[in-house]
Structures are given as structure tokens and as C-alpha cells.
């Protein structure tokens, strides 16, 4: 698939660019994290031409791929590891944008799902964060962690996670958006398979950078020990 090739190239060359690496390291990411999740960056976006409707839609929504240039690129992979969406971070305007292929719209998309899936299958539990950085941080303690890219699970996302997990644990931010997302999810899908936990006033990524890896793991485990027993 053409997005697989694009993501692979963007990941291969990201270490050549000081600005995105400095930013990612400032958010607590290591080179190992960057390689694991295939996070990338390109100055010029070149994507192999494809005659599909997906390609045409992506070409138009990204303004001939110019919207992907000079952005940090977080690939959204399906359960087979194929890229079916992209989340980008603009380092100048400090904004995120998301782009989905038709498959992602139909079955739901997450950041980190492919990497987390073996652990979700094993535990039958999944932790869901809003943002990619929080998911990467939390996954250092509990690898069965994904990012929903928003503070609410849509129907496709919920059904996809339910296929692999008996318990979906929302770890959203303790703010208005996070609280609303939790309540909306519980109202929409009920409490049978959904749970939620607040880890504190800050998010996972902030705690990781503040506490360091060892203290962070101890802190996170103390916050969700009761949920793990259920």
C-alpha cells in the first residue's frame, strides 16, 4: 500500500531533522519509541501514485499532499499493520490534523492499535487515551494501550475494541472535554464493557516527563490496581 511506503520513508529520514527530533525528545520519546510506532517527518511529501478512490480523496484532502509536509506524522495502522490513516502535528502552528482512508472510516482507527493488539488479546483489556503522546507514555507500563485521537469513542472504534477486549478502560484527561467524553461514552454504550480512571490532574505524558520512568510506572500502577483486579 502506498501509505505504508510513505510512512516507512518518513520514519527512516526523521532522525536527519533536528527540529522534530528535539520536539519528540522534549515530549519524552526515545529513538526506540520513534522506530516502534514508525513516527515520521518529511520536508517534501512524495507518495507513489495510485489509481484508487482512496488515493484521490487523500490527494484532495491534503492539498496534493502539501498538508503532510514539515509535519510530524503518526501512522494509524489496522490490525494487519497496514497504514489506513495519518495524524499530523504542525510544529509551528502547534495543531493536529487527521486523514483517513475509507477502511479507517468504516472499521475505526486508532494510533498504536497494531502495536498493542497482541497485549489486548492476551489480557482482554485495553486502555484508551485521547492523544498519541499519552498513549505512548502509558504503554511503557501497560502495552495494551491505544489512542482514540479524540475524547469520545465512535461506534466503529467501540465495536473494533469490543471484538478483542472484554473491558475498555478510558484514561481521558481530567478536563471538560475528557469528562464529557467519558459521560457520553458511558451513556452511549453502557457500563458493562466500559470503565474509566483518572490518573491525576495531569496527563500520562506529563507524569512520565516529571517523574521519570521508574517512578512513573509505580505511580500509574497504584492508580489502576483496582481496575486490573476486576
Regions found by a protein language model. Name each.
Residues 1-71, 80, 120-121, 162, ...:
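TOPRIM metal-binding catalytic domain and adjacent DNA-binding surface shared by DnaG-type primases
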Residues 5-6, 21, 105, 145, ...:
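Short, functionally important structural connectors and interaction interfaces within domains
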Residues 44-165, 182:
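Phosphate-handling DNA/RNA-contact segment within nucleic-acid enzymes
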Residues 84, 123-126, 135-230:
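TOPRIM fold recognition
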Amino acid at each position: 500500500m502506498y501509505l505504508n511506503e510513505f510512512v516507512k520513508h518518513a520514519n527512516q529520514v526523521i532522525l536527519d531533522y533536528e527540529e522534530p527530533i528535539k520536539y519528540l525528545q522534549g515530549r519524552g520519546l526515545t529513538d526506540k519509541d520513534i522506530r516502534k510506532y514508525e513516527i515520521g517527518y518529511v520536508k517534501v511529501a512524495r507518495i507513489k501514485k495510485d489509481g484508487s478512490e482512496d488515493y484521490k480523496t487523500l490527494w484532495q484532502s491534503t492539498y496534493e499532499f502539501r498538508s503532510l509536509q514539515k509535519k510530524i506524522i503518526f501512522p494509524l495502522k489496522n490490525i494487519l499493520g497496514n497504514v489506513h490513516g495519518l495524524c499530523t502535528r504542525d510544529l509551528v502552528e502547534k495543531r493536529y490534523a487527521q486523514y483517513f482512508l475509507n477502511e479507517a472510516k468504516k472499521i475505526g482507527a486508532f494510533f498504536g492499535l497494531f502495536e498493542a493488539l497482541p497485549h489486548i488479546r492476551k489480557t482482554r483489556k485495553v486502555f484508551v487515551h485521547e492523544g498519541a503522546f499519552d498513549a505512548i507514555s502509558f504503554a511503557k507500563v501497560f502495552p495494551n494501550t491505544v489512542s482514540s485521537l479524540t475524547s469520545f469513542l465512535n461506534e466503529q472504534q467501540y465495536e473494533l475494541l469490543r471484538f478483542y477486549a472484554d473491558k475498555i478502560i478510558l484514561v481521558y484527561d481530567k478536563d471538560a472535554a475528557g469528562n464529557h467524553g467519558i459521560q457520553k461514552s458511558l451513556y452511549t454504550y453502557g457500563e458493562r464493557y466500559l470503565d474509566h480512571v483518572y490518573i491525576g490532574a495531569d496527563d500520562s505524558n506529563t507524569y512520565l516527563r516529571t517523574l521519570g520512568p521508574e517512578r512513573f510506572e509505580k505511580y500509574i500502577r497504584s492508580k489502576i490496581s483496582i481496575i486490573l483486579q476486576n
